[in-house]
């Protein structure tokens, strides 16, 4: 690492995007609530602990943190809070089992070097300590949900909050009325939970269609994230889009890919904990990566001291990468440049066990090495904005276009979404019109509200992504069709004049899909 504290020109911003689909009440393992609880325990708990520690050091404007409304809903949901508490306790039990192994047991992993009795005992002792700390952290800080913790970090100026639309839809393919509603209500949801209405958003999948900047301006959004290629790779400054003042910021792929890319990055280092190798009796992950082409049955036991040394190496490397990039980009454009590294939050801890430790150290090391760290709002306030630009239709998916969400592999889901949205909007319009014809103020319609909830869950961008990537594709199709069925079932009863049946159906579906309690169909744009 360049140990010189001489300042370099420009500004560095770290952006994290926190998102999972609505998983509560929809399966447990291997995809479902287990996915939520693993991410919560491995990423969300340590991330907020890291940020709180840095805030206690009087460090400000450290990261720009995107929190989707659907994740916030789960982090505050009593059912989910109870579920993750049980998950953490079960983790501790599994760690205690590993710590007490005395002889080789019959399992698929029994002959792995990382799963010998000696290796498991040593690993289990450390894992017990980790689980105990996580349980204590949860019990003392999280029992009232994630929002109080997030609000404290926002109030302290440690993070800038990015919001987004309800349920994470792929906005370019969404009917304009529902797109406007989802964004406006998503920003309002953040205001209700966190007492902050975000000025910036992480657009789901960094997806953009020409003209969306006008919608953003109308909703009070001042800036949003796109992927680097959307700006033709020139991400050194934010760019106002079209004829608006809404600024698009692009991810610097050269810097971001240093940490994580489809084929390389720090988490694949031989010393780090291997994500894919399990002890098949306890479900714990006791191996290190060892080598990129080393099979699980040959991976060495995890060595935390070796991993810790690798973290320091990668902190130093990243600091040098950021310094050099700021210097070269500032020289190229003839003024101080802005460099943005952006990642999914779940990378840090869930996919990369050592990620939170790396994050804490790098956020201390960058300022010490003369790098100014700030948020996207800081970039706008301090003039890191260039000339207006016209953006192409784009995303951060494969090909940097829309194919992951609109290609032949998911054509049936695109058609399903279109039909369900049409059904929902038509049904809600008729229901509200009938109620409006009565005397007095328009009452809230909980049946129409639930139709909107199920519709928004149907059009979540996660389902076509999972199908296109063949990642739990059957589960993704099941979820899309389940919520489509719920929408059609309630709407069908309502359209047939069976109001009591529609109400019972809506109440039933709400027991599983009761997120966004403030959602109100009366606010749907005309």
Curated annotation (Swiss-Prot):
InterPro entries to which the protein is assigned, alphabetical: 57_glycoside_trans_central, BE_C, Branching_enz_MT3115-like, Glyco_hydro/deAcase_b/a-brl, Glyco_hydro_38_N_sf, Glyco_hydro_57/38_cen_sf, Glyco_hydro_57_N
One GO BP: alpha-glucan biosynthetic process
Organism: Mycobacterium tuberculosis (strain ATCC 25618 / H37Rv)
GO CC field: extracellular region; plasma membrane
Enzyme class of the recorded protein, top EC level: transferase
Keyword Transferase (UniProt): yes
Record's function text: Catalyzes the formation of branch points in alpha-glucans by cleavage of an alpha-1,4 glycosidic bond and subsequent transfer of the cleaved-off oligosaccharide to a new alpha-1,6 position. Is probably involved in the biosynthesis of 6-O-methylglucosyl lipopolysaccharides (MGLP).
SUPFAM superfamilies in the record: Families 57/38 glycoside transferase middle domain, Glycoside hydrolase/deacetylase
Catalytic activity: Transfers a segment of a (1->4)-alpha-D-glucan chain to a primary hydroxy group in a similar glucan chain
Record's keyword annotation contains Magnesium: no
Binding site residues for substrate: 251, 268, 396, 462
UniProt protein name: Probable 1,4-alpha-glucan branching enzyme Rv3031
Similarity field: Belongs to the glycosyl hydrolase 57 family.
An example Gene Ontology molecular-function term: 1,4-alpha-glucan branching enzyme activity
E.C. number(s) listed in UniProt: 2.4.1.18
Superkingdom assignment: Bacteria
PANTHER family: 1,4-ALPHA-GLUCAN BRANCHING ENZYME RV3031-RELATED, 1,4-ALPHA-GLUCAN BRANCHING ENZYME TK1436
Active-site residues annotated for this sequence: 205, 344
Keywords assigned: Carbohydrate metabolism, Glycosyltransferase, Transferase
Pfam families according to UniProt: BE_C (PF09210), Glyco_hydro_57 (PF03065)
Signal peptide, first to last residue: none
């Amino acid at each position: 690492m360049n140990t010189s504290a001489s300042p370099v020109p420009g500004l560095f911003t770290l952006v994290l995007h926190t998102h999972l689909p609505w998983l509560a009440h929809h399966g447990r393992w291997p995809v479902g609530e287990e996915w939520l609880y693993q991410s919560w325990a491995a990423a969300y708990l340590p991330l907020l602990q890291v940020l709180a520690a840095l805030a206690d050091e009087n460090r400000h404007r450290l990261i720009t943190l995107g929190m989707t409304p659907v994740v916030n809903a789960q982090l505050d949901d009593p059912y989910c809070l109870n579920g993750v508490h049980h998950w953490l306790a079960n983790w501790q039990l599994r760690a205690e089992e590993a710590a007490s192994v005395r002889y080789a047991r019959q399992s698929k992993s029994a002959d792995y070097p990382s799963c010998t009795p000696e290796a498991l005992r040593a690993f289990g002792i450390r894992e017990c300590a980790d689980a105990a700390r996580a349980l204590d952290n949860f019990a003392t800080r999280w029992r009232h949900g994630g929002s109080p913790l997030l609000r404290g970090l926002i109030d302290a100026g440690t993070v800038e909050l990015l919001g987004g639309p309800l349920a994470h839809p792929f906005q370019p393919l969404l009917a304009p009325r529902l797109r406007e509603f989802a964004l406006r209500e998503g920003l309002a949801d953040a205001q209700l939970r966190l007492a902050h209405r975000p000025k910036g958003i992480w657009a789901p999948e960094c997806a953009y269609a020409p003209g969306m900047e006008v919608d953003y301006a109308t909703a009070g959004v001042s800036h949003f994230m796109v992927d680097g290629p959307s700006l033709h790779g020139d991400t050194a400054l934010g760019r106002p889009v079209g004829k608006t003042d809404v600024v698009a910021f692009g991810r610097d792929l050269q810097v971001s890919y240093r940490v994580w890319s489809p084929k390389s990055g720090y988490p694949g280092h031989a010393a780090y904990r291997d994500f894919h190798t399990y002890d098949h009796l306890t479900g714990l992950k006791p191996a290190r990566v060892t080598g990129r082409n080393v099979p699980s049955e040959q991976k060495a036991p995890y060595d935390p001291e070796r991993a810790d040394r690798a973290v320091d190496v990668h902190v130093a490397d990243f600091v040098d990468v950021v310094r050099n990039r700021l210097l070269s980009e500032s020289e190229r454009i003839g003024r101080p440049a802005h460099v943005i590294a952006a990642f999914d939050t779940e990378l840090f801890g869930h996919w990369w066990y050592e990620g939170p430790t790396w994050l804490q150290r790098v956020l201390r090391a960058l300022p010490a090495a003369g790098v100014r760290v700030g948020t996207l709002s800081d970039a706008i306030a301090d003039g890191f904005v260039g000339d207006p630009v016209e953006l192409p239709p784009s995303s951060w998916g494969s090909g940097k276009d829309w194919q992951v969400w609109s290609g032949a592999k998911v054509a049936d889901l695109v058609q399903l979404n279109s039909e369900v949205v049409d059904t929902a909007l038509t049904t809600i319009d008729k229901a509200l019109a009938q109620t409006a014809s009565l005397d007095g103020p328009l009452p809230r319609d909980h049946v129409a509200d639930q139709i909107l909830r199920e519709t928004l869950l149907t059009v979540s961008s996660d389902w076509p992504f999972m199908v296109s990537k063949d990642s739990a594709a059957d589960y993704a199709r099941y979820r899309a069709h389940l919520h489509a069925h719920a929408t059609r079932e309630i709407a069908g009863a309502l359209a047939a004049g069976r109001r009591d049946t529609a109400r019972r159906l809506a109440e039933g579906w709400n027991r599983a899909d009761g997120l966004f309690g403030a959602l109100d169909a009366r606010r749907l744009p005309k």
